[in-house]
C-alpha cells in the first residue's frame, strides 16, 4: 500500500466527473487500499478517488473514532434523501478550511462493496453528511461550491498561500 498525493483546490482535475467502475478486480482493490492509507495518513474521514487523480466512482469512508469501520462505495447512487442538516465541513483537498454546508439529514444509497457485491445503506448524522460530501467529488463538486463567490475566493487564496508556504519548506 502507498499514500497517494491529494489534489488541492483550485486544481481543475478536482472538477473531473468520475466514470463508473466496470469490474471490481485486484487493481480496483489496490486503489481502495491506497485510498484508505492516504485518508488515514491525512487524518480524514472520507476520500473520493477524484481527490487522488483517479477518475473512477470510488469512495472510502471511516467516521469511527477507532478508525476501524471501513466503508467502501463503488459506483454509489443516491436513492433517497430526507431532512435538513449541516455542519462545518472540511476537506482534504481544501486544507485547513471549513464552512457550513447544507445537507440532507438522512440518505439511502446503493453501491458495490470492496468485493464488487451490491448493497444498500441507510445513513444519518455524520455518515450521511460524509457520503454526500464524497459523492459530490465524483461529479466534480466541492463544498466551496455551496458558498458565496466572495467566501469561495477567500478560501482559494488561503489554500494557495498554504501550498506556497509548504512548497518553500520542502
Swiss-Prot record:
Enzyme class: hydrolase
Record carries keyword Protein biosynthesis: yes
InterPro entries (alphabetical): Peptide_deformylase, Peptide_deformylase_sf
Binding of Fe cation, residues: 91, 133, 137
Assigned keywords, A-Z: Hydrolase, Iron, Metal-binding, Protein biosynthesis
Record field: catalytic activity: N-terminal N-formyl-L-methionyl-[peptide] + H2O = N-terminal L-methionyl-[peptide] + formate
GO biological process, one term: translation
Positions annotated as active site in the UniProt record: 134
Gene Ontology MF term list: metal ion binding; peptide deformylase activity
One Pfam family named in its UniProt record: Pep_deformylase
Known EC number: 3.5.1.88
Keyword Iron: yes
Cofactor note text: Binds 1 Fe(2+) ion.
Cofactor(s) essential for the protein: Fe(2+)
Family the entry assigns: Belongs to the polypeptide deformylase family.
Function: Removes the formyl group from the N-terminal Met of newly synthesized proteins. Requires at least a dipeptide for an efficient rate of reaction. N-terminal L-methionine is a prerequisite for activity but the enzyme has broad specificity at other positions.
Protein's UniProt name: Peptide deformylase
Gene encoding the protein: def
Amino acid at each position: 500500500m502507498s499514500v497517494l498525493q491529494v489534489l488541492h483546490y483550485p486544481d481543475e482535475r478536482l472538477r473531473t466527473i468520475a466514470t463508473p467502475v466496470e469490474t471490481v478486480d485486484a487493481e480496483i482493490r489496490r486503489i481502495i487500499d491506497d485510498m484508505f492509507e492516504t485518508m488515514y495518513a491525512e487524518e480524514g474521514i472520507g476520500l473520493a478517488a477524484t481527490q487522488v487523480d483517479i477518475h473512477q466512482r470510488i469512495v472510502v469512508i471511516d467516521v469511527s473514532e477507532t478508525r476501524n469501520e471501513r466503508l467502501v462505495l463503488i459506483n454509489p447512487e443516491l436513492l433517497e434523501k430526507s431532512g435538513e442538516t449541516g455542519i462545518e465541513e472540511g476537506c482534504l483537498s481544501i486544507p485547513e478550511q471549513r464552512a457550513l454546508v447544507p445537507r440532507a439529514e438522512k440518505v439511502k444509497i446503493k453501491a458495490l462493496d470492496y468485493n464488487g457485491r451490491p448493497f444498500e445503506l441507510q445513513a444519518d448524522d455524520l455518515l450521511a453528511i460524509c457520503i454526500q460530501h464524497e459523492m459530490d467529488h465524483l461529479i466534480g463538486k466541492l463544498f466551496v461550491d455551496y458558498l458565496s463567490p466572495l467566501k469561495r475566493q477567500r478560501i482559494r487564496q488561503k489554500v494557495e498561500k498554504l501550498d506556497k508556504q509548504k512548497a518553500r519548506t520542502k
